[in-house]
């Protein structure tokens, strides 16, 4: 499927927020919710929620709202969360170690199943049940474990080389913590987490406040 045939990326990015809010509602014992109530939880208008969901079908009934459990099931299916998604993590420094120990992935249908680093001092060490593997073996292990997603937590100067190897190995989706834009083929999906860039975007507003 061509990217132009898909819903807007911003819509896809909001779906996990909807799913998380719906899970919280179920935990609170709430079984029906209006688009207005759901929107208030995640700072989105009711109209935006209805428009987002309209890309995938018809959900809910006017005047009644959404069945929380059914809508959650629909969104999880749209996101592919009814599948198990194995993930490779490359770069086991302090950040990588924290990511490897994060328990939240498994509850969302995602599991880190392979750890890689190029530092001989780290190779062979264990984090939980996983042993850190030599990055030189990444192609073989990715093929064996049928991994399609990877997290990059290496310094910026190493990130492009790592991404190139991962793509060659068959990785189709990358989450990068490296502060640089990766060059990848059009059929590979990339997301970035750059805390410095996010903080700098907020300093704009703080600076404006100080000027007035």
UniProtKB/Swiss-Prot annotation:
Sorted UniProt keywords: Cytoplasm, DNA-binding, NAD, Repressor, Transcription, Transcription regulation
Gene Ontology, cellular component aspect: cytoplasm
Pfam families named in the record: CoA_binding, Put_DNA-bind_N
Record-level GO BP terms: negative regulation of DNA-templated transcription; response to redox state
Keyword Repressor (UniProt): yes
Predominant place of localization: cytoplasm
Family listed: Belongs to the transcriptional regulatory Rex family.
Function: Modulates transcription in response to changes in cellular NADH/NAD(+) redox state.
Complex formation: Homodimer.
Protein name: Redox-sensing transcriptional repressor Rex
Annotated organism of origin: Chloroflexus aurantiacus (strain ATCC 29366 / DSM 635 / J-10-fl)
């Amino acid at each position: 499927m061509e990217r132009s045939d898909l819903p807007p990326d911003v819509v896809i990015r909001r779906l996990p927020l909807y799913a998380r809010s719906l899970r919280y509602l179920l935990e609170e014992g709430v079984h029906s919710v209006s688009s207005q109530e759901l929107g208030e939880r995640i700072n989105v208008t009711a109209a935006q929620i209805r428009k987002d969901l309209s890309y995938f079908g018809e959900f809910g009934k006017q005047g009644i709202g959404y069945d929380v459990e059914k809508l959650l099931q629909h969104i999880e299916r749209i996101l592919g969360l009814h599948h198990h998604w194995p993930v490779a993590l490359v770069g086991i420094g302090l950040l990588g170690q924290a990511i490897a120990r994060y328990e939240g992935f498994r509850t969302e249908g995602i599991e880190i199943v392979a750890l890689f680093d190029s530092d001989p001092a780290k190779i062979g060490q264990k984090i939980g049940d996983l042993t850190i593997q030599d990055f030189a073996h990444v192609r073989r292990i990715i093929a064996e474990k049928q991994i399609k997603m990877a997290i990059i937590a290496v310094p910026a100067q190493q990130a492009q080389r790592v991404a190139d190897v991962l793509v060659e190995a068959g990785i189709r989706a990358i989450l990068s913590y490296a502060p640089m834009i990766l060059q990848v083929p059009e059929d590979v999906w990339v997301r970035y987490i750059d805390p410095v860039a996010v903080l700098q975007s907020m300093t704009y507003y703080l600076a404006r406040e100080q000027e007035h």
